């Protein structure tokens, strides 16, 4: 079938008519006005010959007047890739031969340089794409433009946005001419510009109808003709929006805060990981008396904090919680919404916190015990070692394994040996700013918290450094092959013994995004470990080894601690004793922050192993293509498959595609309102001179060097002295810090994993720098100032050698900064 009337097309015929024609067919089915037209199908394109007779007959039926000839590729107007402007459109084409020529030109545009590059960036194979062409009667517009049925800047589904201009809408679509801009929020529109209020209202009504009926916010091209009739020329999903929260029957609006920022994890969580994490998080929060609904939005974990925001007592405490655990971005969002009347405190809704009351006695005893006996940390590591070594027996069948996967892990009898020292370390570090008010600056306190002992992530990185030193004789081998090749060789037992097996016995249950049970551990997929080893082998100056850097950070910390105690003692002897006590306890206990998670990962390791055993059985039964495909099923779905033999392969394929799309997403909102509004877009814009990026200082010191922009740590390398620029950082990223001269991230919290490790190594860190990975390019010279919280970009013509660029300089600056403060 080579030619179809638009009115005869089924919207599901995308492979035959392409995205644009399928979208127009959907509009026609909804009863909105669409200019008459026809589609030259992909069958004709596959044969490479324009069906002349059929096209001319269809053109005659349109009246043989001016028409628009528009590309309609099968990979166009997709839910995750619009292809806007990537293939050609020809307007006001008139005459049979010109129409035929325009159709051929649309076909040719499928392989244009811009369309090919767009498909490559979107991960769409070139061979899988075919082209149809839409031919429609031209509308002679009085005014035309674009309607977004959600606000593309804020994400709000409560607003429609219109850009309009007199005449053809191409000037608006192409950005070639100024347009009148309208944000339609349901209030009476203004009388201004080229769009009358009645037309604004009509566009909003149409937009809301399309959004509701088509199941997603739409980007709509429209035109009003000289008679005042509204025509819709195209509708496609807005592909850049972050998904909106699921509908809730609770009174709105609701506030959802993303939990991945706490862990430095922005990639989507697999469905099986989501099942596990929602259960774990809800249980953890309940133990502290907090009932928080955990929801999946775009594959990320968000918590509904609306009730806490409206509680007269907890709303102010929430700001402090955000500052400590969620970071300055979340803190700014909560502070902003405290003044929003929609989140005004509501009296009489506070519930008795019975869970917290039940936990309080244990907490008091545990915290006081940790403060009195910090050496009890030895029990922490004893418990961790026991959890890692305890024997586990796996039953042989999926039916027997699944209950072990489904059950909530019961707290181990010795877990309290970990919990209270960890909690105490976090609390002591958190009270230091108040205790040392008017005595120490934030950067000085961060110096004290550098080079801290007992941090399992630091110990892991240092252990890998020792593996690298042992591997020195194999340097050529390890630098000459890719991390993936080396990983395959290691798993096959084909590499020399460099101590990596011993390292993985202890740390192989870790990885980037390690809280997701669906993500392979290093023991299964050690390519990131080999990438880190390659980085370490490039360190030729022993003084820049992580062990030396850690030692220097510890020396600076002890010197600063002594200086702060002296300052406090000069003011009042009692304050000096208190300062000394809490500063020393902070250094002794705050490094344990990672221990609880590290221990909990053993249970996650066992759960993943059992999931893979179930997956292997399902693969043998033909229900999965690969054992690891089990990660794309939730636990309830997995139960249905194991018990009833449901075939999950179609669900798995759809989830894989969705997961791959979300992996490409570059930004994840730290907080959303229930209508999809990204709350950060409501905050006042930061001022900038174009060269200075502002964030939050998280590790003191100053360093200048070439940037290394990394979005995935799996196979990344960082040359000694380069400044690592990343979207985030969790423990799976920290091996890259050993060669970095500084750290810049787009997210994070001062006490989170990345900044903590940066302080241990004495490298400056600035976190929460908006758009850092887009605004900074690899190789660009930048200066990181951890005290000021700034990243300064060199002018394009600046000499790369114009300042310090390696770790020595970064450490020297940090030392001088600390020494200068100590003498103040």
Model-predicted regions and their roles:
Residues 1-134, 143, 384-400, 406, ...:
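N-terminal beta-alpha lobe that positions the nucleotide/phosphoryl donor
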Residues 199, 203-218, 225-242, 707-722, ...:
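Acidic, glycine-rich flexible loop/linker segments
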Residues 49-66, 132, 199-220, 224:
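Phosphate-interacting basic helix/loop segments used at nucleotide- and nucleic-acid interfaces
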Residues 212-215, 226-227, 242, 269-697:
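Contiguous hydrophobic, helix-prone segments at protein termini
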Residues 21, 86-117, 140-197, 232-286, ...:
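Extended active-site and interfacial segments that coordinate phosphate-rich ligands
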Residues 15-41, 70-99, 138-180, 218-241, ...:
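Conserved phosphate/anionic-ligand binding catalytic regions in large, soluble enzymes, centered on
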Residues 33, 38, 66-68, 88, ...:
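Structural motif
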């Amino acid at each position: 079938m080579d030619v179809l009337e638009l009115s005869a097309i089924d919207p599901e015929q995308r492979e035959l008519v392409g995205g644009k024609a399928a979208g127009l067919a959907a509009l026609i089915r909804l009863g909105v006005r669409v200019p008459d037209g026809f589609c030259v199908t992909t069958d004709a394109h596959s044969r490479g010959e324009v069906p002349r007779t059929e096209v001319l007959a269809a053109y005659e039926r349109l009246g043989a007047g001016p028409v628009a000839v528009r590309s309609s590729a099968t990979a166009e107007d997709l839910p995750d890739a619009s292809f806007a402007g990537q293939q050609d459109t020809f307007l006001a084409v008139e005459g049979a031969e010109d129409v035929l020529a325009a159709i051929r030109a649309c076909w040719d545009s499928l392989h244009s340089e811009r369309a090919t590059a767009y498909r490559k960036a979107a991960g769409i194979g070139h061979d899988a794409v075919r082209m149809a062409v839409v031919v429609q009667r031209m509308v002679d517009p009085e005014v035309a433009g674009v309607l977004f049925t959600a606000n593309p800047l804020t994400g709000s589904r409560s607003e429609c946005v219109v850009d309009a201009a007199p005449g053809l809408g191409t000037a608006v679509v192409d950005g070639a001419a100024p347009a009148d801009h309208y944000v339609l929020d349901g209030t009476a529109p203004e009388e201004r510009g080229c769009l009358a209020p009645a037309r604004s209202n009509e566009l909003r009504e149409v937009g809301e109808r399309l959004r509701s009926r088509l199941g997603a916010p739409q980007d709509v091209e429209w035109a009003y003709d000289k008679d005042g009739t509204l025509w819709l020329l195209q509708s496609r999903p807005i592909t850049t929006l972050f998904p909106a929260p699921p509908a809730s029957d609770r009174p709105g609006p609701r506030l959802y805060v993303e939990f991945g920022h706490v862990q430095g994890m922005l990639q989507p969580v697999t469905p099986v990981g989501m099942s596990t994490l929602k259960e774990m998080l809800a249980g953890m929060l309940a133990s502290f008396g907090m009932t928080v609904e955990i929801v999946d939005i775009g594959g990320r974990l968000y918590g509904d904090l609306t009730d806490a925001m409206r509680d007269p007592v907890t709303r102010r405490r929430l700001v402090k919680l955000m500052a400590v655990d969620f970071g300055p971005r979340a803190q700014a969002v909560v502070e902003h919404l405290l003044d929003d009347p929609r989140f005004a405190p509501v009296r009489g809704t506070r519930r008795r916190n019975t869970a917290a009351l039940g936990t309080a006695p244990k907490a008091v005893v545990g915290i006081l015990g940790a403060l009195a006996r910090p050496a009890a940390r030895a029990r922490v590591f004893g418990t961790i070692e026991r959890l890692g070594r305890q024997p586990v027996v796996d039953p042989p069948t999926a039916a027997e394994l699944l209950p072990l996967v489904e059950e909530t892990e019961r707290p181990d009898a010795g877990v309290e040996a970990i919990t209270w020292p960890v909690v105490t370390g976090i609390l002591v570090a958190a009270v230091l700013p108040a205790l040392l008010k008017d005595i120490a600056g934030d950067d000085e306190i961060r110096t004290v918290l550098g080079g801290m002992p007992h941090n399992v992530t630091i110990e892991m990185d240092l252990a890998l450094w020792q593996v690298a030193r042992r591997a020195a004789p194999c340097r050529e081998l390890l630098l000459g092959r890719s991390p993936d090749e080396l990983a395959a060789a290691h798993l096959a037992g084909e590499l020399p013994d460099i101590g990596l097996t011993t390292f993985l016995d202890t740390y192989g249950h870790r990885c980037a995004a390690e809280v997701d049970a669906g993500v392979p551990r290093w023991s299964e997929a050690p390519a990131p470990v080999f990438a880190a080893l390659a980085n370490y082998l490039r360190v030729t100056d022993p003084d820049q080894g992580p062990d030396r850097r850690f030692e220097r950070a510890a020396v600076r910390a002890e010197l600063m601690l002594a200086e702060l105690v002296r300052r406090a003692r000069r003011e009042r002897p009692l304050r000096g004793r208190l300062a000394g006590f809490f500063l020393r306890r902070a250094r002794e206990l705050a490094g344990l922050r990672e221990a609880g998670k590290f221990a909990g990962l053993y249970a996650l390791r066992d759960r993943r192993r059992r999931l893979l055993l179930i997956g292997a059985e399902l693969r043998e039964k033909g229900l999965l293509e690969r054992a690891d495909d089990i990660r794309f099923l939730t636990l309830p779905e997995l139960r249905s498959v194991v018990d009833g033999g449901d075939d999950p392969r179609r669900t798995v394929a759809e989830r894989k595609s969705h997961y791959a799309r979300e992996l490409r997403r570059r930004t994840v909102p730290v907080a959303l309102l229930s209508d999809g509004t990204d709350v950060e877009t409501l905050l006042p814009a930061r001022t900038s001179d174009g060269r200075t990026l502002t964030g939050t200082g998280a590790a003191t010191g100053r360093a200048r060097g070439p940037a290394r922009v990394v979005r995935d740590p799996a196979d990344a390398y960082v040359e000694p002295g380069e400044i690592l620029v990343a979207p985030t950082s969790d423990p799976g990223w920290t091996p890259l810090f050993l060669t970095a001269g500084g750290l810049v991230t787009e997210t994070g919290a001062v006490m989170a994993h990345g900044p903590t490790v940066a302080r241990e190594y004495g490298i400056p860190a600035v976190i929460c720098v908006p758009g850092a990975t887009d605004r900074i390019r690899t190789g660009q010279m930048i200066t990181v100032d951890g005290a000021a919280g700034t990243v300064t970009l060199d002018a394009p013509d600046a000499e790369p050698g114009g300042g310090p660029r390696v770790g020595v300089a970064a450490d020297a600056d940090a030392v001088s900064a600390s020494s200068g403060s100590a003498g103040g």
